C-alpha cells in the first residue's frame, strides 16, 4: 500500500516544526548542490528560519555577485516587458527599501564572515567558499604589496644612480678646479722667482793713475754733434788731447 499524500499546512508544535525545518533544509541544500554539480548550473539558495536565522547556498564564489546578476537580469526583463510604462509609473518605495535592507544585511554578514565571526551556521561548502575567497584576497594583497615594494626599490635605485652621477660630476668639477688653481699657483711662483733675481752689482769706479794712459775713451762734451761724414783723424786727435790732459796738468804743477 502506497504512502498517502502529506497535507501541507503549518506545524503547530514548535519542536516538530524545528525538526522538520532542519531535515528539509538539509535536503534542500543537498538538492541545490546536486543540481549545480550534475547539470553545471548556477544555483543560489537563501533560507530564513522562523527566528530570522539565515541559511544559504551558492555555486558561485560569492552570493553578492549572484544577487547583482539577478538584479541586472530582472531590470532588463522589466525594461523589455514595459519599455514605456516605467516613465509614468510611481516607484515602489516599499520594495526598494526591502531590497536595500536585504543587501545591507548580506554585506554585514559577509563582513562578519571575513572577520572570522558568526561561522557556526555555515556549512562545509560555505566554509570552503569563504576560505577560497580569503585566499584569493590574500593573493591580490600580496601581489599589490610586492608591486609597491618593487616600485619603491626601483625609485630608490634611480635615486641612488642620480646621486652617484651628481657626485661624479662634482668630483670632476673639483678636480678641474684644483688643476686650474695648481696651474695658477705654479705661474705665480715662476713670476715671483723671476722678480727675486738680484740685479747686477755696479763695479766701483777706479781713478786712473796720472802716469798711466787709459785706452778707454773719456767722456767729453760734443757741442757740434757728430756726423757720419766727419774726419776720423780729427776725432782721434781730440781723443788723444783729452787723454793727455791730466799729464800736462801734473807737469805744470812741478814746473810752477
Curated annotation (Swiss-Prot):
GO terms for biological process: cell differentiation; floral meristem determinacy; positive regulation of transcription by RNA polymerase II. Keywords: Activator, Coiled coil, Developmental protein, Differentiation, DNA-binding, Flowering, Nucleus, Transcription, Transcription regulation. PROSITE patterns: K_BOX (PS51297), MADS_BOX_1 (PS00350), MADS_BOX_2 (PS50066). InterPro entries: MADS-box/MEF2_TF, MEF2-like_N, TF_Kbox, TF_MADSbox, TF_MADSbox_sf. Pfam families: K-box, SRF-TF. Gene3D superfamilies: Transcription factor, MADS-box (3.40.1810.10). Coiled coil: none annotated. Residues 1-61 form the MADS-box domain. GO terms for molecular function: DNA-binding transcription factor activity; protein dimerization activity; RNA polymerase II transcription regulatory region sequence-specific DNA binding. It is found in: Nucleus. Residues 90-180 form the K-box domain. One of its GO terms (cellular component) is nucleus. Probable transcription factor that promotes early floral meristem identity in synergy with APETALA1, FRUITFULL and LEAFY. Is required subsequently for the transition of an inflorescence meristem into a floral meristem. Seems to be partially redundant to the function of APETALA1. Homodimer capable of binding to CArG-box sequences. This is Transcription factor CAULIFLOWER. It comes from Arabidopsis lyrata subsp. lyrata (Lyre-leaved rock-cress).
